[in-house]
Each structure stands twice: as structure tokens, then as C-alpha cells.
């Protein structure tokens, strides 16, 4: 854990290992493969692959990364698309899993994948994306590994049209309306309404006669110690209480929240831990909180939902519609170019 989608050139990703979509003969291909060879150094990488020879379909082998910012290149032999009836899904999942196993074997903390088989291999992008997400998610739930899925465009995403349309409508109803407020339209209406209310009150006072207000009671300054005694639960205290109340294992929660074990340990050991907002929202999804419960959790960390934040409205939509799969939430956020939840 965690698993994140990024939009980047895979040859520039500073992970411990990057994955090359390879053929059985480990020869340089086109597209992503060619870009990796050129960035790593064609002669060195070609010689290294020739020394290995061949690799079976659905498996992966390792070479040095040479001039790339990564340490290793995992060459995953991907299937071409032949209609889906020739074991392509199992072979593609196997290629991902084999590369992930290499990451563990070479003690990598991070690995970056392109969307395997989706280019010149002809695999339908939505199906390729779903296999990538499912295979990677299953693996990182059991291993401490950060995995990046590097995507060039939104066309790879498996967001159903119905869900996307529903989110789009929700954002239009809330986020766009709030932006109207920021341009002054809503504020102007409220000012006019408030002015009318004050005029009506003034007229009432003139008719009834002004009544002097009672003297205000003197305010007693509260000591700093008193204020500290009345602090609410800290974020850490509230988070651990929510986990206990639900009878969940810590590991279940941080994995469902796209949080690494190391990150959770830091939170757990520090009562005054100050999380990032995306971390709080990730735990809200991982704990399957309601919107009201999420508001309380945010408050414990010094945050609140922002009406001017598209990310916040997307998360609120997911909470309202009980979408608690962190990868589905992050896919929607990625679709709208918003920061994803988790580490």
C-alpha cells in the first residue's frame, strides 16, 4: 500500500522499478517500450535483454534501469487481444502479478506500471484498466509496496457512464452553484434580503418605541488551561475509537484507506498527529463513515469540507452514495484532475 494513478511519462517516474510491456523475445517494441529503451540506453538495455533470451507470456524478468531514474526495469510479457476467448485476461493479470513479485524479490518500495497491453497490443482500455486495478489492489492489500499506474489520458479509466453522469450532475448542483456565489450573485441576493429584514425591524422599533437593551453581563476571561481542558478529541484519538467501535483490525482500515503501514504507525504513536486533509478523507472512506461522521473527523484534525473544493464535493458524493471502494473514489478524483486520497 498505497496504490495511486498518475499522469506522467513513465521514463521520468522516480520509482524503484518501472515496468516495460515486453514481447517473448524481449526485443524492443514500439510506443512505451521504445520510449523506455531510448531513455535507458538502447545498447545497454538490448544487451541485457539478449543475455536473458526469452520470457514466457504472463511472466516478467528484471534488468538494470541504466540511465533511467529507476533502479530496475521489469519486462512483463503481455498478451495481445484476440477477442477475449484465448485466456488474455489471465495472461495479463499474470504479467502484473509476476512484476509485483519481482518488486518483492528485489526489495523495492515502489514500482510504476504503464497500462499493459492497452496500446499496440490492442487490449480494450477499460478492460485492461480493470484488470490492472484488481490485480494490483489484491497484491498491495498483502504487501507493503507503493504502486503507481501511469496513464497518459482519461480514456483508460473504467468509470461507468451512468456513475460519471451522476457525479457530473452532483458537482454541477453544488460546486458550480458555489462558484456563482464566489462571483457575487448569491451574496448580492443575501445582502438585499438582509437589508429588507433590517428595514422591517427598524420600522417595527419606530412604531413600538425603542426599548433599551439590558446591560450585558461582564465577560470573564477564560484561562488557557481551561481552554485546553475543553479541547475535543484529537484526530488520532477519534480515529482509533472509530476503529474500535466498528470492531475492525487496524490493518484492514489502513489498507482500505490506501494508507501505508508505516504512515498508520506514525499516526497511532502520536496523539497530536496533524494529518493532511487527504489522509482524513481517506480514513473516512476506509471506515465507511457517513457525511456527518466525516465532518466530525475532519473537525478533529482542524479541517472542514470546503464548498469551493471540487475534490470535497466528489468525496461527499461518494459518501452520500456509499461508494467506499478507495480505488473507485480515486479513479473519480483522477478523472477530474483532483488530488487522490491516501498516502
Task: Describe the residue ranges of each PLM region.
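A short, Lys/Arg-rich alpha-helix, primarily the initiator
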Residues: 211-250, 327-343
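The alpha-helix within a helix-turn-helix
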Residues: 243, 254, 284
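Phosphate/ribose-phosphate-bearing ligand recognition and processing surfaces
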Residues: 80-201
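Glycine-/small-residue-enriched capping loops at alpha/beta junctions
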Residues: 1-103
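Short amphipathic recognition helices of helix-turn-helix/homeodomain-type DNA-binding modules
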Residues: 293-342
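Recognition helix of helix-turn-helix/homeodomain-like DNA-binding domains
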Residues: 258-275, 299-302
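Short, basic-rich loop-to-helix N-cap that marks the start of a DNA-contacting helix
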Residues: 271-285
Amino acid at each position: 500500500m498505497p496504490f495511486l494513478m498518475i499522469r506522467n511519462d513513465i521514463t521520468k517516474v522516480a520509482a524503484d522499478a518501472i515496468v516495460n510491456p515486453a514481447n517473448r523475445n524481449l526485443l524492443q517494441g514500439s510506443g512505451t517500450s521504445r520510449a523506455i529503451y531510448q531513455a535507458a540506453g538502447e545498447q545497454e538495455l538490448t544487451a541485457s535483454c539478449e543475455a536473458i533470451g526469452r520470457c514466457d507470456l504472463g511472466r516478467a524478468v528484471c534488468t538494470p534501469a541504466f540511465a533511467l531514474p529507476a533502479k530496475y526495469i521489469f519486462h512483463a510479457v503481455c498478451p495481445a487481444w484476440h477477442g477475449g476467448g484465448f485466456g488474455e485476461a489471465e495472461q495479463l493479470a499474470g504479467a502484473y502479478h509476476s512484476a509485483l513479485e519481482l518488486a518483492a524479490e528485489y526489495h523495492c518500495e515502489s514500482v510504476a506500471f504503464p497500462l499493459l497491453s492497452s496500446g499496440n497490443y490492442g487490449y480494450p482500455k477499460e478492460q485492461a484498466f480493470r484488470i490492472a486495478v484488481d490485480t494490483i489492489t489484491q497484491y498491495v492489500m498483502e504487501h507493503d509496496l507503493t504502486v503507481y499506474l501511469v496513464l497518459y489520458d482519461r480514456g483508460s479509466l473504467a468509470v461507468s457512464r451512468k456513475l460519471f453522469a451522476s457525479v457530473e450532475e452532483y458537482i454541477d448542483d453544488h460546486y458550480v452553484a458555489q462558484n456563482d456565489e464566489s462571483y457575487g450573485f448569491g451574496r448580492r441576493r443575501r445582502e438585499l434580503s438582509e437589508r429588507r429584514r433590517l428595514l422591517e425591524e427598524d420600522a417595527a422599533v419606530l412604531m413600538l418605541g425603542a426599548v433599551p437593551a439590558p446591560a450585558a453581563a461582564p465577560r470573564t476571561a477564560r484561562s488557557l488551561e481551561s481552554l485546553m481542558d475543553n479541547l475535543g478529541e484529537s484526530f488520532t484519538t477519534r480515529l482509533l475509537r472509530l476503529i474500535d467501535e466498528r470492531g475492525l483490525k487496524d490493518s484492514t482500515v489502513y489498507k482500505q484507506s490506501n494508507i501505508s503501514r508505516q504512515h498508520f504507525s506514525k499516526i497511532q504513536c502520536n496523539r497530536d498527529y496533524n494529518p493532511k486533509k487527504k489522509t482524513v478523507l481517506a480514513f473516512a472512506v476506509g471506515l465507511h463513515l457517513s457525511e456527518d461522521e466525516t465532518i466530525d473527523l475532519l473537525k478533529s484534525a482542524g479541517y472542514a469540507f470546503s464548498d469551493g473544493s471540487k475534490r470535497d464535493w466528489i468525496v461527499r458524493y461518494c459518501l452520500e452514495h456509499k461508494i467506499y471502494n478507495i480505488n473507485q473514489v480515486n479513479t473519480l478524483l483522477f478523472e477530474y484532475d483532483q488530488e487522490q486520497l491516501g498516502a
